[in-house]
Amino acid sequence: AVAAESSTGTWTTVWTDGLTSLDRYKGRCYHIEPVAGEDNQWICYVAYPLDLFEEGSVTNMFTSIVGNVFGFKALRALRLEDLRIPPTYSKTFQGPPHGIQVERDKLNKYGRPLLGCTIKPKLGLSAKNYGRACYECLRGGLDFTKDDENVNSQPFMRWRDRFVFCAEAIYKSQAETGEIKGHYLNATAGTCEEMIKRAVFARELGVPIVMHDYLTGGFTANTTLRHYCRDNGLLLHIHRAMHAVIDRQKNHGMHFRVLAKALRMSGGDHIHSGTVVGKLEGEREMTLGFVDLLRDDFIEKDRARGIFFTQDWVSMPGVIPVASGGIHVWHMPALTEIFGDDSVLQFGGGTLGHPWGNAPGAAANRVALEACVQARNEGRDLAREGNEIIRAACKWSPELAAACEVWKAIKFEFEPVDTID
């Protein structure tokens, strides 16, 4: 029934069935296995003919695969755990606007994770004060600052004013540090036309990157923005706001690894992926599974990490995972070890909550990162020696020492809801 409803079937036989080849177009369930430890749950493998899907359209793909079938009365629950995108279909998508290597070259930054900060409070600041916070963080040593997902164009801070003050912060901090800086200017809007207008203004300001909320904005809007960014040299940061409504429950909805694959096809250079160690949901092996699906060109099937199918992206550019949410300097060794160089480590309160101010908070993060990267390059074990590495760096960085003192007791020790077993 699931395969039929999402392909050629309906609730009764219809006379127009005779006008086409149902055998050619119908979906097929080709394997069923029980879920270990559950009496009434099964994993079903369903295959669909490629002719059912419009080329280059994530919107059409999801309308078929996760459409009406999820509302069937006959099903207590239904969850899409994974999907394999065959190369024949994935080649109809252009993928990320630029990809990891092109971003490295644009920023001229290599050999370490990138550092970011989400400006807080996320709502309520005036555009001028918002821009000031951006400048202080970038001047202190961060690579990026960021609009939060619900910063669009509200009465207290209209989008055009925010873009102007953030651009000023970028140029001023670049002149003082000699490094390329950026701010994720959120172009998400109520219409595609307005979204593109904001992206055009960002390009005219000469900033390197814009941002989109791809689930609330929609895949059609996201792919539209992706094409504009590719054509005009803008990097595209993606926020996954609303994902937990879809992916957090174990028995219904869709796993984030599916949303991650869809984003790679629709287009984005960064996407939030959880932290493993922070305040947001994310088991380590499962998170690393979909991080590999975002970054790597070829990923082998690995059920231990939740990867049900071997995925060949056929040289589609990779997406940089962004670790963000409840992280601070004590997490830096673990984040560096877990995510590696091709990642963005994004601290909001972990920068702006520094007792000495925003710039010292940024400096503390940069020193902690540089210390961890140096220790790793020297062959030290970050997982085992991480705290020792951070304490040693505190001796020559008073900003880091102050940050370590403030957050020494802050932990987020909750069991994840969505686990592999």
Curated annotation (Swiss-Prot):
Its EC number is 4.1.1.39. It catalyses: 2 (2R)-3-phosphoglycerate + 2 H(+) = D-ribulose 1,5-bisphosphate + CO2 + H2O; D-ribulose 1,5-bisphosphate + O2 = 2-phosphoglycolate + (2R)-3-phosphoglycerate + 2 H(+). The keyword Cell division does not apply. Its cofactor is Mg(2+). The modification N6-carboxylysine is found at K146. Transmembrane segments: none annotated. GO terms for cellular component: chloroplast. Substrate binds at N68, T118, K122, R240, H272, S324. Mg(2+) binds at K146, D148, E149. One of its GO terms (biological process) is photorespiration. The keyword Transmembrane helix does not apply. The active site is at K120 (proton acceptor), H239 (proton acceptor). Heterohexadecamer of 8 large chains and 8 small chains; disulfide-linked. The disulfide link is formed within the large subunit homodimers. Belongs to the RuBisCO large chain family. Type I subfamily. RuBisCO catalyzes two reactions: the carboxylation of D-ribulose 1,5-bisphosphate, the primary event in carbon dioxide fixation, as well as the oxidative fragmentation of the pentose substrate in the photorespiration process. Both reactions occur simultaneously and in competition at the same active site. NCBIfam families: PRK04208.1 (NF003252). The basic functional RuBisCO is composed of a large chain homodimer in a 'head-to-tail' conformation. In form I RuBisCO this homodimer is arranged in a barrel-like tetramer with the small subunits forming a tetrameric 'cap' on each end of the 'barrel'. This is Ribulose bisphosphate carboxylase large chain. It comes from Aegilops crassa (Persian goatgrass). The gene is rbcL.
